[in-house]
Amino acid sequence: MNQYKNFIMQFEDIVGNNNVLIDEPMKKHTSFKVGGPADLLITPTTLEQVKDSIILCRNNSIPYYIIGNGSNLLVRDGGIRGVVIKFLKLGDIKVEVDRVIAQSGAPLTNICNEALKSNLGGLEFACGIPGSVGGAVTMNAGAYNGEISQVIESAKVIDKDGNVFLLNKEQLDLGYRMSAIQKYHYIVLEVTFKLHNSEYDTIKNRIMDLNRRRTEKQPLEYPSAGSTFKRPEGHFAAKLIEDTGLKGKSIGGAQVSEKHSGFIINKGGATAGDILNLIEFVQNKVKEKFQVDLHTEVRIIGEENN
């Protein structure tokens, strides 16, 4: 049993007995399908439970990690010491005139579909992004010339001391794959998007077109975390990797996708170690050839295997 067993009952008091898992394999909770066990994994069902869980962790010096859909996450093979707070059950979405308000765990696809039903445009670019809205805002996710920064109005967040407050668009300070949320280690609880009225068919056709392009160009048939690397200034990561001759390069079960060099995929039976070794190999080779540093877009957490 792990060192946090003494807190199991306290977490169960907060989130309920059925929402606390012990030594939970993180490969069940990430799109890469890899990762060792988390000491505890809890799934709060209300924002108040999130706040109480964070305060319990803070007061007892328990490390904690927030995850949504696990789609931009790589957990090392040794797993996670401490508590994973998964926002899976915090997915409420409501539409108020031209605004869509969503809890942090709501999948982007669900939010896009609610906007579509209400003839609200602006989020079409996000419909194929597999993550939840909390993670999307934290990293200012984007695709096909669209970014969260273009449509967000505000975000309700919580800090490490359990204080809840609202950040407007300016305070969120959204840049390329960055935000004030990352900088100050805030956690997103709820997001308000301001959209525009549009025709149902116009929105639907745009979504279908972007999803068709994704399917044609991206290795969606394999586990991955989407684009592995951020776009280096003045370059495209996929082109640098391809021009280095690394398309199809494998280490263990991890491979640089033959369909899109910007994706590292789990071809089958990969470990987190395989993926991390391949990431480092690609970074080194691209640096040698082009003197360009590739930085990961995927979030990497957890312990190495002993």
Swiss-Prot record:
Has keyword Nucleotide-binding? no
Organism lineage = Bacteria, Bacillati, Bacillota, Clostridia, Eubacteriales
* Species per Swiss-Prot/TrEMBL record: Clostridium botulinum (strain 657 / Type Ba4)
Keyword set, alphabetical order: Cell cycle, Cell division, Cell shape, Cell wall biogenesis/degradation, Cytoplasm, FAD, Flavoprotein, NADP, Oxidoreductase, Peptidoglycan synthesis
Entry protein name: UDP-N-acetylenolpyruvoylglucosamine reductase
**Residue ranges of every copy of the FAD-binding PCMH-type domain listed in the record:** 34-198
Give the matching Pfam families: FAD_binding_4, MurB_C
Q: Provide a Gene Ontology MF annotation, just one.
A: FAD binding
Keyword Oxidoreductase in the entry? The reply is yes
